[in-house]
Structures are given as C-alpha cells and as structure tokens.
C-alpha cells in the first residue's frame, strides 16, 4: 500500500490490487503492553493482539492497511494476508503455525477480526462494537483499552462511570479506533456505540473474572445427517464461580464422545502448543478449545463430555438423523484416525498457571534515599502445579536492562535495587512445564535522583538499546531492531564510560 501512489504515478494505466496485504501478526487473547511500543517478539513466543505487533516488511498497522485503499480509487481492493492462521510460516518465531490470520487455526476470531468488521460493515444495518483486552491484570497497572466499532461515536464506562467519549471517522487512519488508558482494578468495562442522533445501537462488556470453576460446551449445530461427511464444531470454554468467561484460562481439558459420534480432533489455536490435534486432551488457550465431532454412519445421539481437574464437567447431547447418501467407509476412517503421539498426554492431569498477580507495598518510584522495594507474586489458580518463578528487569520492549538488580527473598518475593534513573519493568514468568516462558506479568517502576547509567564499551550492548536514531527503524526478531528497507538509517548508542585508561570523547 505504501508504494501504490508512486506506482500509479509511474504507470497510470496499470490495474492495481493487493493480493497479499497487511501481514500484521497477532495471537488470540494475548496482549503485550504498552500499546505505544512496537513489540514484534516477546518471551512468551506470542504476538500481541493490541495492534502493536508488525513485521518490518508489512503494513505499519491495521488502520493503514484498511484506510489506504479508501483514498486510492485506482486500486481494485485487497486480500488480507491472511484470513486464517495456517500451519507453517510462523513469522517471527519457529513454532507450529502462522500468526498472520484474523482467525486462529481453531476458527476463533482474534481482535483484528473485529477491527476489519468495524471498517467494512455498515452501522445502519449491522451495528457492532468490540472491547479489548480482557479485564484481569495487576492492581494499578496501566492498561491500554481499545474499542472497535462501525458507529460514528463510542463511549467507555467503568463500573457505570463514564471514562470518555470519542467521535470516529472510518476514513481517517488516526481516528478509526477509540483508545483509552486506565489503571486496572476489578470491575466491568462497558463500551457503547451511538448513531448520528445519539441513540445507542450496540454495546460490549468485559468483566473481571476469577479462577475457572466449570466448563461450558456450545456447538455450531445440534443435529446433523449421519452421512459421514458432516462435522460438528464444539467450543469449550471455562467459567468462573459467577459465570463469567475466564479469558486467560489454560486448564487441561479431557474430552470423551459416546454414542453415534467420534472425536475427530482438538485445537486451541496456540502456535506454541505442539500436542497432537487428533488426541483426546489439550489445554485451553486464552480460555478456549475446539472439539471436532465426527458422527458415525448411524442415526442416534452423541454425548460429548468435557472434564478438567478441579472443575465441574460439562455435557452436551447432539443428534444425528438417518441419511440415504453416505460417504465411503475409508474416508470416514481417515477422518477419525487417532494420532499415536496423543497417548503421551492422554492421561495428563497438570493444572497450569493462568496468570501471575504482582504487587508492591511501596509506591513503584525508587530514589537515592529509597532505592529498593519488595515485590510479591501470586499465581492463579492457587492449586496450579508448583514451579519456579523467573524474574528479570526489562524496558518496555522486554529487553533486559542494567538499571537495577534483583535479589531473591523466597519463592514468591523479590527485592529490586535501582542503580540509575529511568523507567523499567520487573517481569515474572512461568513455563508451565514446557521449558520456555509461556506467560508473564510485569510491574512498572520509575527510578529518579539516582544518576545516569553509562554503558560499558568493553562488552556487548544489545542492539535495540540505542539512544537515538535517524531514518526508518522497525521491529526485529528476538527483541531486536531492524533498519528500514529503503533509505539510510543511522543509530546512536551511549553514554559510555571508557574508564581511566580510555577516552570518553
């Protein structure tokens, strides 16, 4: 899209259309803060759904991709890359499947799906509104809240108190999304869409939630012909004790199918999850799991049961009706064949951590007179498998920085000691048995009146910790930085301290 105007000027008789546009990357239900920082890669192996995870060769953001064509009458339109995630090409990682989709491999929409819906649908006939992210973070943590709507006006409320109102113009790149930032506390976010006359036409809510208490099953249909060609897609999600969806649930779920049906497969849409599709148990990812049910060639009932340690089971009854035209037995057997690798996890009973709550009794401001503070961590649910917590000090992009050190007090408490002025984050993460970070929580600190941190010129410096740049600088892999594909980019590092035998000039 960024090349269209020049190409049209050079070749006014050419037909232009976008065969592969966007290429933004996102993981369903994963949010890397803050929104203002571009974050292509992170410790959890996921891509942020806030809209701040982009590759250096793709569109700079979803807004640019969606709006550009509206102002280019010589363009026939575009095909987003991609509609669905697909197995392979897992830019920017080396995991199972891609992150380009607006819908994940399990068929669950990501937030980006609702963004394009807000641009490409008519509020007069199909009004819509969507809030992101979910609402469960550290107390006081500043959270970027985004609202997508096709309406001309949106308002955000917290616990029925108005946070703000915004008028939107869906032809303007910088005025297509309603954005707010507010400190987290438990409660209810409500977004309301209004038409030109000020009438409410749509609303969406996000509730704070607790640990998973029960499972819920819902099917795309409750009855199918018993022809061996139909599949039933059953969504499994977790609810807390008050009935609210647990949007970051990671519970391991076992699925059994009885009667005139068989379990064809399970998928949660998580690119970092290598467990087989054709097994009988998987973990929820961002609170969801899909079970694919294949009816037999006989009419009757199918009973689907989902169970998880410590949770109430969920049961769903489906029906199949007699049908004259049936598929071949060979095709039906191919559909239901089990992956032998699934036996390795079939009886797993682990209870993974779904979130980590970090807190600090003192204000998160460190000074020369009080350069340290103690941070505590609480993992959820309380009965999750015991595992070590990994701690580190990073900048907003997740790069380890030398501004402070950490001292372990016990399994859930750590002391931070600041060495220099600056803003930084303490990150706490877990692996949930995978050998690599699967989720983290972070707490922001500010250090002042301590002094400037000089870089060591006699050791390596992380490339993305530059202090000044001219030209285009984009996201790189592994918390790195990439120079632009066109023009000249210069990057400056400092300040350095060369010691008594070097020169600082």
Where are these regions (language model features)?
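Short beta-strands within extracellular/lumenal beta-sheet-rich domains
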Residues: 475-504
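Extracytoplasmic soluble-region selector
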Residues: 164, 181, 193-195, 202-205, ...
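Proline/serine/threonine-rich low-complexity linkers at boundaries of modular beta-sandwich domains
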Residues: 116-128, 206-214, 336-356, 482-484
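Substrate-binding/catalytic cleft of secreted carbohydrate-active enzymes
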Residues: 1-139, 143
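Low-complexity, acidic Ser/Thr/Pro/Gly-rich terminal tails and inter-domain linkers that flank the onset
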Residues: 209-225
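Structural beta-strand segments of beta-rich domains
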Residues: 141-145, 230-234, 371-375, 489, ...
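Extracellular ectodomain segments of secreted/surface proteins
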Residues: 117-140, 349-368, 490-499
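Catalytic cores of secreted or luminal carbohydrate-active enzymes
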Residues: 79-214, 244-246, 252, 449-475
């Amino acid at each position: 899209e960024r090349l269209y105007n020049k190409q049209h000027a050079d070749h006014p008789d050419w037909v232009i259309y976008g065969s592969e546009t966007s290429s933004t990357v996102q993981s369903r239900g994963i949010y890397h803060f803050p929104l203002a920082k571009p974050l292509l890669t992170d410790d959890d192996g996921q891509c942020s759904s806030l809209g701040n995870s982009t590759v250096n060769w793709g569109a700079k953001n979803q807004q640019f991709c969606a709006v550009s064509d509206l102002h280019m009458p010589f363009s026939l339109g575009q095909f987003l890359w991609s509609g669905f995630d697909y197995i392979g090409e897992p830019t920017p990682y080396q995991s199972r499947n891609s992150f380009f989709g607006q819908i994940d491999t399990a068929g669950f929409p990501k937030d980006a799906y609702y963004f394009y819906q807000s641009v490409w649908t008519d509020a007069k006939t199909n009004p819509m509104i969507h809030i992101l992210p979910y609402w469960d973070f550290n107390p006081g943590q500043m959270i970027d809240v985004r609202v997508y709507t096709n309406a001309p006006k949106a308002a955000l409320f917290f616990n029925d108190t108005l946070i703000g109102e915004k008028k939107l113009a869906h032809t303007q790149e910088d005025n297509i999304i309603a954005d707010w930032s507010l400190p987290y506390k438990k409660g209810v976010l409500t977004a309301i869409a209004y038409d030109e006359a000020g009438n409410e036409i749509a609303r969406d809510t996000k509730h704070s939630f607790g640990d998973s208490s029960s499972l819920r099953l819902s099917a795309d249909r409750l009855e199918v012909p018993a022809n061996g060609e139909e599949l039933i897609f059953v969504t499994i999600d977790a609810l807390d004790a008050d009935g609210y969806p647990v949007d970051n649930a990671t519970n391991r779920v076992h699925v059994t199918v009885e009667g005139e049906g068989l379990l064809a497969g399970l998928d949660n849409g998580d690119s970092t999850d290598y467990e087989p599709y054709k097994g009988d148990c998987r973990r929820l990812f961002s609170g969801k799991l899909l079970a694919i049910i294949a009816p037999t060639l006989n009419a009757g009932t199918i009973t689907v049961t989902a169970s998880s340690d410590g949770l109430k089971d969920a049961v769903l009854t489906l029906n199949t009706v007699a049908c004259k035209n049936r598929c071949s037995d060979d095709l039906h057997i191919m559909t239901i064949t089990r992956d032998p690798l699934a036996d390795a996890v079939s009886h797993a009973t682990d209870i993974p951590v779904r979130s980590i709550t970090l807190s600090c009794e003192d204000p998160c401001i460190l000074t020369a007179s009080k350069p340290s503070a103690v941070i505590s961590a609480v993992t959820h649910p309380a009965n999750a498998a015991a595992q070590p917590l990994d701690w580190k000090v990073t900048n907003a992009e997740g790069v380890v920085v030398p501004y402070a050190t950490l001292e372990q007090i016990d399994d859930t408490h750590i002391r931070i000691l600041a060495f220099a002025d600056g803003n930084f984050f303490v990150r706490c993460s877990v692996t949930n048995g995978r050998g690599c970070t699967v989720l983290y929580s972070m707490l922001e600190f500010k250090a002042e009146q301590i002094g400037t941190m000089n870089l060591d010129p006699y050791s390596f410096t992380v490339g993305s910790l530059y202090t000044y740049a001219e030209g285009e600088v984009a996201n790189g892999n592994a918390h790195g930085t990439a120079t632009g594909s066109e023009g000249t980019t210069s990057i400056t590092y400092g300040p350095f301290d060369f010691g008594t035998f070097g020169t600082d000039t």
